[in-house]
């Protein structure tokens, strides 16, 4: 026991007396056993610490140590009372014998009475202070020690040495400070966030697996209520990742959601593939663990490629900041992939949120949001959307565009029971499908504007020169003009719900799309119609009868893979179809052009490794038709083609076009019965179709400039002279829509939106007089992809009006014109 030095001297000096007193005390006790002994350390005795003796200092007044350990007030006692306390503390037996034989001094009794009065006054003051502290509790947090450290009024404080008392007091302070910090955080959260809604939605089946997930994740979200929760947790887990001896990482709301989604997917896969259920069950834990990090790894790799190794942050945590409104500048950060706005005071979300189309995670939980904007449906990359504990009553139909959404948190909202029950029974994906199949909330767009062009290519303003458009409508059928359409109609075998998840199921049905395609094609009354992705059976059984009723005849050629199929399966293969009005054009010749067959049948194309591995396994084709324009006698060659789709094979597309242009020179010589290069250059020709190439690709450059070399699309490839010397052609070609800088897009989807369809024409003999303009911008801003309720294909049609510059025509060929369409799929070119 550690005793101060001045007390040690006192104890050592009184050791002999202490032993004598103990012997005397035993004798007295034996001789006076019948006499009652006064209690030692009873109530009001000076031998113990008084419960009412507390320091009257600032700490006590502020209530920081309320209900805590009470300290003895030795500084307020007179010297004689201090001596009595010391004797009782260090010599209890001696003090006990004196208490039996000697009465207390009257002065000491008077002092004790005064002391009791002071203690009563202090009790009253302390009660008043407690009332004031309760009123100021939010401003000045209190420290409440654990129950084991608190004492009642009548309880005696056990005697402990000073150093043990000091250690206990320090432990009490540490526990009190820790509890104070927790109370401060709770009070701060209560001040910043609105009252939580802990009542669940009254659904029909609250025990369903999907609704249990809602409640579990909602509770986890409610617990994540500290400011910058996600940022703090990310930083903590990052530190744990660097330390191999650290604890297991804490699971966040996002991680828990990923685990739940992975488990559900595993169950669905096991049901669809019962034979592999055992193996899937064995790998379940591994798969779940991988799924937690797969998205992060893929995103990091994608961002590295996007930023070329530069660091770019893509997550923003504004949770628990008491935000009432959001600045419009926030939505200029269109690179954001995760945005956390939970535990704020937001009452609405601005419609400008649709600019954040890279968002994958959005947390709006624990706010005061009354309505979700329909523009949020444009954030089609969202995978996790948390709306827990708000005032949302319904969801907009545009949420059907959230094709990647894996989980939608709606617990804690007074939401429509129809929506809540659907989520509880079938989950988030079925809810999105239900909303997608509802009637579209936006109306049909206005018709695409028809644009007239001057001879120099300038667009005629319909406001300043309305007569030009009136005359064009009245005199549309002039002798030296013709109109043509190029349209990828989307083969019905490609129009699946898996491929076009953003399209309502009823809008993908072939019956609906077929009627809409027929209406759109016949609406423009084009003299010549070139279609791509037309099924073989559909051409013969649908398009030929329909088009014949409006004065058209047609020719068709399907893709080369049909040669390896049975007769029934080959009818499902798509190809290119060309329809022409018999009163405008006379068909002179038709040729089926197979890119791979032409390449293999000619010695001028070097058979390289890239040719066999990348080019030969593609079955793309072109349909070549040679017409006589009846009014003028002009011979015009039309090429209708569909190139390979994959952007990873841009070199293959370039080679396909290079071979096509190379062979067209020979074909033109044959049709025109001439070997003159100048005559071939000035011949009338139109090449249209789906080229699956943008303006930046080598295909566009080859058409527009006549040559391409050292392009990134061809880098590292070997195609003989084409890559050694570059691609070249002698035709003078121009894009019909080059007069308007090309359309903003000819195909639109969540993954890709751009112009990839073109109409190329020979400038020496033809000029553009009219174009079908772009789709209404307001309408397209609310669409994430075609087809939809108003557009039956994933492409839009291109319509152009051409004028033949020269009158008359070349001499007709000696062979008899072929009026009968050739429906055979074999190539007419001998190789």
Swiss-Prot record:
Keyword terms of this UniProt record: Cytoplasm, Exonuclease, Hydrolase, Leucine-rich repeat, Magnesium, Metal-binding, Nuclease, Nucleus, Repeat, RNA-binding, Transcription, Transcription regulation
CDD domains for this protein: Deadenylase_CCR4
Recorded superkingdom: Eukaryota
Major site of localization recorded for this protein: cytoplasm
Molecular-function GO terms, alphabetical: metal ion binding; poly(A)-specific ribonuclease activity; RNA binding
Cofactor: Mg(2+)
InterPro entries xrefs: CCR4/nocturin_mRNA_transcr, Endo/exonu/phosph_ase_sf, Endo/exonuclease/phosphatase, Leu-rich_rpt, Leu-rich_rpt_4, Leu-rich_rpt_typical-subtyp, LRR_dom_sf
Enzyme kind, highest EC tier: hydrolase
Sequence positions that bind Mg(2+): 533
Entry's Gene Ontology BP terms: DNA replication; DNA replication checkpoint signaling; nuclear-transcribed mRNA poly(A) tail shortening; positive regulation of transcription elongation by RNA polymerase II; transcription elongation by RNA polymerase II; traversing start control point of mitotic cell cycle
Family named by the database record: Belongs to the CCR4/nocturin family.
Cited function: Acts as a catalytic component of the CCR4-NOT core complex, which in the nucleus seems to be a general transcription factor, and in the cytoplasm the major mRNA deadenylase involved in mRNA turnover. Ccr4 has 3'-5' RNase activity with a strong preference for polyadenylated substrates and also low exonuclease activity towards single-stranded DNA.
Name used for this protein in its record: CCR4-Not complex 3'-5'-exoribonuclease subunit Ccr4
Record organism: Debaryomyces hansenii (strain ATCC 36239 / CBS 767 / BCRC 21394 / JCM 1990 / NBRC 0083 / IGC 2968) (Yeast)
Classification of source organism: Eukaryota, Fungi, Dikarya, Ascomycota, Saccharomycotina
